[in-house]
Amino acid sequence: MALLHSSRILSGMAAAFHPGLAAAASARASSWWTHVEMGPPDPILGVTEAFKRDTNSKKMNLGVGAYRDDNGKPYVLPSVRKAEAQIAAKNLDKEYLPIGGLAEFCKASAELALGENNEVLKSGRFVTVQTISGTGALRVGASFLQRFFKFSRDVFLPKPSWGNHTPIFRDAGMQLQGYRYYDPKTCGFDFSGALEDISKIPEQSVLLLHACAHNPTGVDPRPEQWKEIASVVKKKNLFAFFDMAYQGFASGDGDKDAWAVRHFIEQGINVCLCQSYAKNMGLYGERVGAFTVVCKDAEEAKRVESQLKILIRPLYSNPPLNGARIAATILTSPDLRKQWLQEVKGMADRIISMRTQLVSNLKKEGSSHNWQHITDQIGMFCFTGLKPEQVERLTKEFSVYMTKDGRISVAGVTSGNVGYLAHAIHQVTK
């Protein structure tokens, strides 16, 4: 300690006798970043942090969009465990993937989305690249639009849309516009408003569509409504940009959930599509996704693929290996694929059951409100229709956490806490 003290004294003396040392120290203390302001907290992560600090044993976190089992625990699909075991037994290397990703994964993803017998796949007039989950697919797609979609910089999002859509497209250099989608009066789809707004969008603009399980509302168009939307899109010559983060997870049927995408293609509309395996395979942390562009012909697809690779190279060079191997193993193994589809249906069915039980318990509580929208909506999320002040009461009085707009993740509801949730909602809405 004495030696350390002496060295500090000597350092101070040196600085006093040598002004240059003091100036250097002062220069090191300055910063390039004094003008950088503290950014706003992420609204969903903020909910989670508040939940963690709460000591109430009955607390519920309904903000996070991750599936939980009926005990409220994270769920790793048995089919994923089997795929991991098969991969481990092969003692494979950990070499870089190509820029476009794992070939068998890309092929299987396109088949899952479009259907194995789709004309697009048979003719080869498509390109699919592996991406860093759905967010990466969106960013790659947005960057491709910014560079090559020469007709317009406007991307029209449904109101509301997933919160990350806006910064993804904005940071890629696109401009954001909106069209009516959710009707707060009915807690349902504003079909007439959406159709009217879409029909007024300038020709050759980009229209973003949620393929299924709209996030955050859980409100989806019916097939006959999708048909009318597709008709307007074709008439107005709009570019349909599909985000499909929940295939199979919405209804429990992957083909049903992909119906809108396939219908648009059948109508001669060349779309692009973002996929994620975070929800339907539970591969949240593996970051597994895909981006597909449907083209005029195979030659055009090759040109598009070449440019996608040029875009990806400076973004992240190449995508992660492990998650793509897991997904490809499941999708290309008949037994594992069958098991996985059953597990996806099981997850979807549990969420549907929780919706039904919540409404049933609200009726038992004596609520006079119409809660039918809870069972009408689909997928992981539910727009409850709760007002911000009611959400605040739920948090303060009952330790029930959700985003301020009243969105809840139904996956966070279990048979053990659904009664408590119904009681809490009734107390703040009666």
Curated annotation (Swiss-Prot):
The gene is Got2. Its EC number is 2.6.1.1, 2.6.1.7. It is found in: Mitochondrion matrix; Cell membrane. Belongs to the class-I pyridoxal-phosphate-dependent aminotransferase family. This is Aspartate aminotransferase, mitochondrial. Its cofactor is pyridoxal 5'-phosphate. Coiled coil: none annotated. It comes from Mus musculus (Mouse). The modification Asymmetric dimethylarginine is found at R313. Acetylation of Lys-296, Lys-345 and Lys-363 is observed in liver mitochondria from fasted mice but not from fed mice. The modification N6-succinyllysine is found at K73, K90, K107, K122, K159, K185, K227, K296, K309, K338, K363, K396, K404. In eukaryotes there are cytoplasmic, mitochondrial and chloroplastic isozymes. PANTHER family: ASPARTATE AMINOTRANSFERASE, ASPARTATE AMINOTRANSFERASE, MITOCHONDRIAL. Its main location: mitochondrion. The keyword Ubl conjugation does not apply. One of its GO terms (cellular component) is myelin sheath. The modification 3'-nitrotyrosine is found at Y96. The modification Phosphotyrosine is found at Y96. The modification Phosphoserine is found at S143. GO terms for biological process: 2-oxoglutarate metabolic process; aspartate biosynthetic process; aspartate catabolic process; aspartate metabolic process; fatty acid transport; glutamate catabolic process; glutamate catabolic process to aspartate; glutamate metabolic process. It catalyses: L-aspartate + 2-oxoglutarate = oxaloacetate + L-glutamate; L-kynurenine + 2-oxoglutarate = kynurenate + L-glutamate + H2O. The modification Phosphothreonine is found at T48. The modification N6-acetyllysine is found at residues 59, 73, 82, 90, 107, 122, 159, 185, 234, 279, 296, 302, 309, 338, 345, 363-364, 387, 396, 404. Keywords: Acetylation, Aminotransferase, Cell membrane, Lipid transport, Membrane, Methylation, Mitochondrion, Nitration, Phosphoprotein, Pyridoxal phosphate, Transferase, Transit peptide, Transport. Gene3D superfamilies: Aspartate Aminotransferase, domain 1, Type I PLP-dependent aspartate aminotransferase-like (Major domain). Catalyzes the irreversible transamination of the L-tryptophan metabolite L-kynurenine to form kynurenic acid (KA). As a member of the malate-aspartate shuttle, it has a key role in the intracellular NAD(H) redox balance. Is important for metabolite exchange between mitochondria and cytosol, and for amino acid metabolism. Facilitates cellular uptake of long-chain free fatty acids.
